[in-house]
Every structure is written in C-alpha cells, then in structure tokens.
A protein has these predicted regions:
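Membrane-anchoring alpha-helices and their flanking helix-loop junctions
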Residues: 1-146, 155-218
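Conserved SAM-binding loop
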Residues: 149-151
Length: 218
C-alpha cells in the first residue's frame, strides 16, 4: 500500500509539476484513468499472493537484456510525461487534437489498460521481469487473451504507452514514448526467444498461437 501511494504521488508530481498548473484537464484524465487501473489491478490480484510477491520482489534469473530495457525505457516514459506537461501546460508547442481524435486516443488508452489487466489476471506467472520462474513451477499460460497472442500484456502496454502522450495532449512527447515502444517490442522478441528455449511446452504453444503481439497480424 505504501508503494502504491508513493507511485500515485510520483505520477501526480510528474504530471502537474511539469505542466505548472492544476487546471490541466488532460493531465487529470490521464491521472484518473491510471489510478483507476492501478486500483482495479489490486482488486484483480487480491487472491494471487504468489504473483503479488513475484511482482514486488522477483526471484533470481532476470536476464541482462531486461535490466538494460528498464534502464532505458523508464527514463523515456518519465521523459514523455514531463515533455507532455511542459508542452501542453506551459509552451503549447502542439495544437490541440479535436474532440473526436482525443476521444479515440482515450478509448485506445483505456483498451490498452484493459488488455494488460486481463493478461495479468489470466497468467499466474505474470512477472515484472523476464525470467524463467522454476522456483514457482512456471507453466505455459493458454487462458484468456493468451489464446489470441503470446504476449497480450505487452500488447496492452504498447497501446496505453503510445496513447499516453496524446491523452496528455502532446505530439512532441511521442518521440520519447515511441523510442520506449521500440524497446518494448525488442524486449518482447527476446523474451519469446527465451521462453521457446527454456520453458517446457512453449514451442508447442507457439505452433498453436502464431501471433506474437498483434492477433492475426504478427
């Protein structure tokens, strides 16, 4: 709970300190949806004590490339929020999208969170890091969204990640967030290779579910 409260406080600080204003309505939309998603996540995992422990304190075996991913992607995501706040709240570099475009971006943002949460609930091995969870008896998840693509959690992350700058009202923030999205796609490919090599029955699962990220596309 302390960690969750701290995360919410940091998110609020990034959004509203960077914009320099509290009447930043796009910031409030982003903040409220993000907090609602965090609260729903806590409720969905209310009986998944093993998964909660794994996500808070992952076991041994995190891959070196995953450490590199976090070192690069975290500042990019934070930077995107800061750039968006400065852009929309102070400098006004970006023109405001129309109501229809903004509504569409918000819908995709919410959809991304929904897909991410669905995957998190369906997969009891939804760790926060890339590792083989031999200590937890990891098996292949074939339930829920995993019937349609092999990495639905990353699909959800891509959707709400790429929509974050637009929900915050900034086109310029797409630059750092776009780089973060490229890194996430690379992480997905590396993790899929790791699972194919080291997780029992994953190669057979790949034959049954052909799509890596986008169902029916790739």
């Amino acid at each position: 709970r302390v960690r969750s409260a701290l995360g919410i406080a940091i998110l609020a600080g990034l959004v509203f300190l960077s914009s320099g204003r509290l009447d930043y309505w796009q910031g409030w939309v982003f903040f409220c949806v993000s907090v609602a998603a965090a609260m729903l996540s806590a409720w969905l995992l209310r009986d998944r004590f093993g998964l909660i422990a794994e996500r808070l304190h992952p076991g041994k075996g995190m891959k070196w490339w995953d450490k590199g991913y976090f070192m690069l992607s975290t500042p990019l995501y934070i930077g995107a929020i800061i750039v968006a706040g400065i852009d929309t709240g102070r400098r006004h570099w970006s023109s405001s999208p129309g109501a229809m475009i903004y509504g569409l971006c918000l819908a995709v943002f919410v959809l991304g969170h929904a897909v991410f949460l669905w995957a998190k609930r369906a997969n009891p091995f939804f760790s926060s890091v890339a590792r083989i969870q031999s200590d937890r008896g990891q098996t292949v998840c074939r339930e829920g969204p995993y019937k349609f693509c092999r990495h639905p959690g990353y699909l959800g992350g891509l959707l709400f990640g790429l929509m974050t700058p637009l929900v915050l009202g900034s086109y310029w923030a797409l630059i750092p967030q776009g780089l973060a999205a490229v890194l996430l796609i690379g992480r997905t490919c590396l993790e899929d290779r790791m699972l194919t090599k080291d997780l029992l029955w994953y190669a057979e699962y790949k034959q049954a579910v052909r799509s890596l990220l986008f169902p029916g596309v790739w």
